[in-house]
From Swiss-Prot:
Catalyzes the attachment of tyrosine to tRNA(Tyr) in a two-step reaction: tyrosine is first activated by ATP to form Tyr-AMP and then transferred to the acceptor end of tRNA(Tyr). One of its GO terms (biological process) is tRNA aminoacylation for protein translation. It is found in: Cytoplasm, Cytosol. GO terms for cellular component: cytosol. Belongs to the class-I aminoacyl-tRNA synthetase family. This is Tyrosine--tRNA ligase 2, cytoplasmic. It comes from Arabidopsis thaliana. GO terms for molecular function: ATP binding; tyrosine-tRNA ligase activity.
Length: 748
């Protein structure tokens, strides 16, 4: 490749900022600017080059099959121009992105082979490797996951789903196509790459412009002063009429970097090249964007009777002759074939003489090009009916009395169990199954989170289970709890732990795990799992999981709310959970985990044990809400607060259905005390109930009056909460945590 000529102005120029630009900077600017069909913005590029001797330029590719000349020759020319102008070029080998986009069937080993093959071509074809770094996305992200993933999540939080969908052209898709959740994650990650690589310039194709603009918009949102300059290069069309770009899946549309001379000749011969027409003519495009920049001239050899040989120095001269008919399509094609073959010969030689390159090419040629995402939406959702059989065996396994007893304890936690036979089988075979529970630290703790969790965890540990409680701090951030402030979220998590300790949780066999710490520590295992779940589930399926965040699929969602279910599903496998013990509102994502097992043919599916959701205190409130204090009793509420809230609670006489006071007796008081004492002098005297059925019978007949029910409920709740109050009054750490939490504003 010949030296690059620089057409520089003879005098220095001045930027709008008032900065004087030297002739040297003008020269560098002209070289760098020549790379892009479009620059956003020219003044910023000049300013950057004037202030920074070695700006960082980000380029990249998905390793996805054989390399065509648009990827090969144009990238080589662009990189060589950039390094000649003093830039440091970071070439991002986007293996994880190819995986999410299901290139090569999502086979990371094959993707790695293709990446190495690309590097061999760049070397053989003349890329100047000085000031060029090839970086594998998986390696770099794994090495600095604690820096990268919070950035991805922040971008996801700050952009609506609609904004992200507008970036689908970067993957050759439209926002109206059937998308997978991975396509949403892909955009957020590519946007993050710009900042992760500390790029001053994004040098990618015009088809990547939407995500580069997203990065600039993100700078505005986070008030980052230095935005990346976008330098978008031209997209070479395919060889046939109407093909906007070369396609690996259609070999006739593209010339590959190791094509033999005869193959190049045949492809160019068959290429679309209408006489006298320049617009939409791929042969002329290749001359303009490859041959002229490479050789600085284009030589046409022909008989004297057709005008003789001619060497063109500018594209304008070529188009003038072509439009007038002086340059015939056949002569153009012959000259183009000859020039391309001259450029490609060193690559052919390298792949014939270098054994490593030869082996790589052989493997790559054997790979099938794929694009279809293997979504789990085609997998039939399993039957959700509950097996209520009281059989003492599961899958033909005879259960011991001890296993039967364990089963009854564990099963009593769940309003629903999917599936009971699987639970019996698990308890019969595994002495200490792992149970996954968790919470978003998002404000004060109400009794549904406090008392019910203590009761459930103590039951599980008494039955031999190991309980892993997932403190979902990153999830609270994704859901914009406490304004997404991780320091505040951390404070709330510590406050929750204090309450459970004071409330009587047996910490033997219980682990509290911070999501951010665990994910950062095991990122190389966790994030590929998230990506695989995302690529196997279409967007509609993930949207149906919005309920786990208290959202509906019709709401205006951020991209974070697509990432959240994929991550929560991955948590189950990261924690190696046998049982998912969460509320009924989390059921859809737990089902997603079981569907994923079916999709990847994993035999042991997590058992779903979904506990009841306590309603709010007022009529029609499906669950307690921290944002409405009148709907909830908090774990450190004073006795007077509890009494006032219960006295105002909805409690219609003789009506059991939708009666929150009776719900609290059933799910909090009876499991805690194994009895419910009602004291009443005027309404039949004192009575102790040992079953909820007896309470219901008396309430429906009117023998148990709402006023007496409420008084007994107040007393039982206050007995339960008193140790927590005492702890938060006497323990300085707990007292300080509570003061902070009470001051935090609840946000959504």
């Amino acid at each position: 490749m010949e030296a690059l000529s620089i057409n520089a102005p003879t005098q220095a120029s001045t930027l709008p900022s008032g900065l004087q630009i030297s002739k040297e900077v003008e020269k560098r600017y002209n070289v760098v600017r020549s790379v892009g069909e479009q620059c956003i913005h020219d003044d910023e590029l000049k300013d950057l080059l004037a202030k920074k001797a070695a700006p960082v330029c980000y380029d990249g590719f998905e390793p996805s099959g054989r390399m065509h000349i648009a990827q090969g020759l144009m990238k080589i020319m662009n990189v060589n121009k950039l390094t000649s102008a003093g830039c440091r070029v970071k070439i991002w080998i986007a293996d994880w992105f190819a995986y999410m986009n299901n290139k090569l069937g999502g086979d990371l080993k094959k993707i790695r082979v293709v990446g190495e093959y690309f590097k061999e071509i760049f070397q053989a074809a003349g890329m100047n490797s000085e000031n060029v770094e090839f970086l594998w996305s998986s390696d770099e992200i794994n090495a600095k996951g604690d820096e990268y993933w919070p950035l991805v999540m922040d971008i996801a939080c700050r952009n609506s789903l609609a904004q992200i969908k507008r970036c689908m052209p970067i993957m050759g898709l439209s926002e109206n196509e059937e998308l997978s959740a991975a396509h949403i994650l892909y955009v957020c990650m590519q946007c993050a790459d710009t900042f992760f690589l500390e790029a001053d310039i994004c040098q990618l194709g015009m088809d990547q412009q939407t995500v580069n603009l997203l990065a600039r918009d993100y700078c505005d949102v986070v008030k980052r002063e230095n935005k990346p300059v976008i330098l978008s290069h031209h997209m070479l069309p395919g060889l046939q009429q109407g093909q906007k770009k070369m396609s690996k899946s259609d070999p006739s549309s593209a010339i590959f970097m190791e094509d033999e001379e005869a193959e190049v000749n045949v492809k160019i011969k068959k290429a679309y090249c209408p006489p006298d027409i320049v617009e939409g003519n791929p042969c002329l495009e290749y001359v303009k964007h490859i041959i002229l920049p490479w050789f600085s001239e284009f030589t046409v050899e022909r008989d004297e009777k057709y005008g003789g040989n001619r060497t063109f120095k500018s594209f304008e001269d070529i188009t003038t002759d072509y439009e007038s008919g002086q340059l015939h399509p056949k002569d153009l094609k012959d000259a183009l074939s000859k020039a391309l073959n001259k450029i490609l010969q060193p690559v052919r030689d390298h792949f014939k003489t270098n054994s490593r390159a030869k082996n790589l090419l052989k493997q790559v040629k054997g790979y099938k090009v794929t694009r279809v995402i293997p979504t789990a939406s085609s997998t039939k959702e399993e039957d959700l009916s509950i097996n209520t059989s009281a059989s003492s065996s599961a899958a033909g396994l005879q259960m011991s009395e001890e296993a039967e007893m364990k089963y009854k304890i564990v099963r009593s936690i769940g309003e629903e169990c999917i599936q009971e036979d699987e639970l019996k089988n698990l308890l019969a075979k595994k002495p200490a199954p792992i149970c996954y529970d968790g919470f978003e630290p998002s404000g004060r703790m109400h009794i549904a989170q406090g008392v019910m969790k203590v009761t459930n965890v103590n039951k599980l540990t008494s039955a031999g289970c190991q309980v892993k409680i997932w403190i979902a701090d990153w999830f609270a951030q994704l859901n914009n709890k406490l304004g997404g402030d991780l320091e505040r979220i951390r404070v709330v998590g510590e406050y929750f732990k204090e309450i459970w300790q004071a409330g009587g949780m047996n910490n033997d066999k219980v682990e509290f795990l911070w999501a951010s710490d665990e994910i950062n520590g095991k990122g190389s295992k966790y994030w590929p799992l998230v990506m695989d779940i995302a690529r196997r589930n279409n967007l509609r399926r993930i949207l149906r999981c919005g309920q786990i965040m208290g959202r509906s699929e019709t709401e205006v969602l951020s991209a974070a709310q697509i990432l959240y279910p994929c991550m929560q599903c991955a948590d189950i496998f990261l924690l190696e959970a046998d049982i998912c013990q969460l509320g009924m509102d989390q059921r859809k994502v737990n089902m997603l985990a079981r569907e994923y097992c079916a999709d990847i043919k994993r035999k042991n599916k997590p058992i779903i044990l979904s506990h009841h959701m306590l309603p709010g205190l007022q009529q029609g409130q499906e669950k307690m809400s921290k944002s409405d204090p009148s709907s909830a009793i908090f774990m450190e509420d004073e006795e007077a607060d509890v009494n006032e809230k219960i006295s105002k609670a909805y409690c219609p006489p003789k009506t059991v259905e939708g009666n929150p006071c009776l719900e609290y007796v059933k799910y909090i008081v009876l499991p805690r005390f194994n009895e419910f004492k009602v004291e009443s002098e005027k309404n039949g005297g004192n009575k102790t109930f040992n079953s909820f059925e007896d309470i219901v019978a008396d309430y429906e007949t009117g023998e148990l009056h709402p006023e007496d029910l409420k008084k007994a409920l107040m007393k039982a709740l206050n007995i339960t909460l008193q140790p927590v109050r005492d702890h938060f009054k006497t323990n300085e750490r707990a007292k300080n945590l509570l003061e902070q939490v009470k001051a935090f504003r609840v946000t959504r």
